[in-house]
């Protein structure tokens, strides 16, 4: 009986990516709790207020931080990339919730996928661009 009630609740889905992180985000009507990979958001993001603020930023900009629970499955990368990928996923889910949300989120920059990623190492070099020391003689 409870499963039927839970499946009837409106769920909004968004996917976010940043560096090598991928976050699959679900917004469910609730009290504003953040759950990442089955853990509380505070615990998963190591109680770092910056990461928590980044992840919840799109909801706060629209004044909906206490209206929806954020359920996230994330993998790859580190905490910074995961927090940014969660932010993009939440913003995309909010656009699905109401197309009117798109413009304010776009102005804030929450719908922009950050294309910066680690550049591959090239052969003959020590890193992506660092060359071995050059000796003229």
From Swiss-Prot:
Q: Where are the stretches annotated Disordered?
A: 105-137
Q: Where is the composition biased (Basic and acidic residues)?
A: 105-117
Oxidoreductase recorded as keyword: no
Tell me the keywords, alphabetical order: Ribonucleoprotein, Ribosomal protein
Among its keywords, does the record have Repeat? no
One Pfam entry name: Ribosomal_S9
Q: List the molecular function annotations (GO) for this entry.
A: RNA binding; structural constituent of ribosome
Q: Which InterPro entries match?
A: Ribosomal_Su5_D2-typ_SF, Ribosomal_uS9, Ribosomal_uS9_bac/plastid, Ribosomal_uS9_CS, Ribsml_uS5_D2-typ_fold_subgr
Question: Record's superkingdom?
Answer: Bacteria
For bias type Basic residues, the affected ranges are 118-137
One Gene Ontology biological process: translation
State any GO CC term.
cytosolic small ribosomal subunit
Q: So what family is this one in?
A: Belongs to the universal ribosomal protein uS9 family.
Its name, as the record gives it, is: Small ribosomal subunit protein uS9
What's the source species for this entry? Cyanothece sp. (strain PCC 7425 / ATCC 29141)
């Amino acid at each position: 009986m409870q499963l039927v009630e839970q499946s009837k609740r409106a769920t909004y889905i968004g996917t976010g990516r940043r560096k090598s992180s991928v976050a699959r985000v679900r917004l469910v009507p609730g009290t504003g709790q953040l759950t990442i990979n089955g853990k509380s958001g505070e615990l998963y993001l190591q109680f770092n207020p910056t990461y928590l603020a980044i992840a919840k930023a799109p909801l706060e900009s629209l004044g909906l931080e206490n209206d929806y629970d954020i359920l996230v499955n994330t993998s790859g990368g580190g905490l910074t990339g995961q927090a940014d990928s969660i932010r993009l996923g939440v913003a995309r889910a909010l656009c699905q919730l109401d197309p009117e949300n798109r413009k304010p989120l776009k102005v804030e920059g929450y719908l922009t996928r950050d294309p910066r990623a680690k550049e591959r190492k090239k052969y003959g070099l020590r890193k992506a661009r660092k060359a071995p020391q050059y000796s003229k003689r």
